[in-house]
């Protein structure tokens, strides 16, 4: 069973899709990465449905079919608010237990939601599975100073399409055929990410046992630094390093996807 629709709050429309197998053993909410959208996550959705899991996926603000300035955000707080809206709207359709999967920025959003819960409620997810989570991008120490110097003169930047997967068909599709791919990147999003880089370093230790899956050929995030930061925050963290895998683990080559 497939359900699709839009949630509206404060003028923001969120495109949401839900897949439900005949017999469900639980549910998964997928949070996609920056510059992605639900349409790129078919491999993962198929695998989860084969495991008899209900699957929820939504397009982030400014991505896919959701509204908002393309690829832009003022604060990662807005992403967390959007995630909470999706969780509330889909709660009655998602059998327990509820799992979270986040790719890159999606992992950062799931982490921020976990850290920001201070109202005494139990965390909604029984597991968080983070694929190449964004804590700090690669070469950030240099790039942040260049960004500060040039931002007053450059509200947007040319996008560089990276070789972030060994799946050549995926890379070709994203670069040449995907109508949802922006070719200019807003400086506002980089500012929001910079705030996140500082913010995650200020959070206290958390007992939640997150599960991190990371490729050792990732050239998008500073993954060694990120692992160190996450291990300092989550002493019960599980870690799986995938040899030869790049950054976009959801769309890696088929052999690597099986391991992931």
Where are these regions (language model features)?
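N-terminal cap/lid segment of alpha/beta-hydrolase-fold proteins
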Residues: 1-21
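Short beta-strand/loop motif that positions the catalytic acidic residue
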Residues: 206, 212-214, 218
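Catalytic histidine-centered segment of alpha/beta-hydrolase-like enzymes
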Residues: 245-258
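Catalytic nucleophile-loop/oxyanion-hole region of alpha/beta-hydrolase
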Residues: 35-38, 64-94
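Conserved alpha/beta-hydrolase
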Residues: 38, 45-69
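Short alpha-helix in the alpha/beta-hydrolase fold that links the catalytic acid
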Residues: 208, 222-231
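Active-site glycine-rich loops that stabilize anionic/oxyanionic intermediates
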Residues: 33-36, 216
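Active-site nucleophile loop of the alpha/beta-hydrolase fold
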Residues: 128-138
């Amino acid at each position: 069973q497939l359900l699709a629709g839009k949630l509206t709050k404060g003028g923001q429309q969120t495109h949401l899709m839900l897949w439900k197998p005949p017999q469900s053993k639980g549910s998964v909410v997928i949070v996609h990465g920056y510059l992605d959208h639900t349409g790129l996550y078919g491999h993962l959705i198929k695998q989860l449905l084969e495991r008899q899991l209900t699957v929820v996926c939504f397009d982030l603000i400014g991505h896919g079919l959701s509204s908002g300035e393309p690829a832009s955000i003022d604060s990662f707080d807005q992403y967390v608010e959007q995630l909470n809206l999706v969780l509330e709207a889909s709660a009655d359709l998602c059998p327990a237990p509820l799992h979270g999967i986040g790719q890159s920025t999606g992992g950062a959003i799931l982490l921020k939601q976990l850290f920001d819960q201070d109202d005494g409620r139990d965390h909604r997810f029984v597991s968080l599975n983070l694929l190449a989570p964004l804590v700090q991008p690669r070469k950030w120490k240099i790039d942040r100073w260049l960004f500060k110097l040039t931002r007053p003169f450059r509200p947007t930047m040319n996008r560089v399409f990276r070789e972030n997967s060994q799946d050549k068909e995926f890379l070709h599709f994203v670069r040449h055929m995907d109508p949802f791919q922006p070719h200019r990147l807003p400086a506002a999003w980089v500012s929001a990410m910079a705030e996140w880089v500082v913010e995650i370093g200020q959070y206290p230790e958390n007992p939640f046992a997150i599960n991190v899956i990371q490729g050792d050929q990732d050239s998008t995030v500073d993954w060694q630094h990120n692992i160190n930061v996450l291990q300092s925050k989550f002493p019960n963290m599980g870690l799986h390093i995938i040899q030869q895998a790049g950054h976009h683990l959801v769309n890696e080559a088929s052999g690597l996807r099986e391991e992931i």
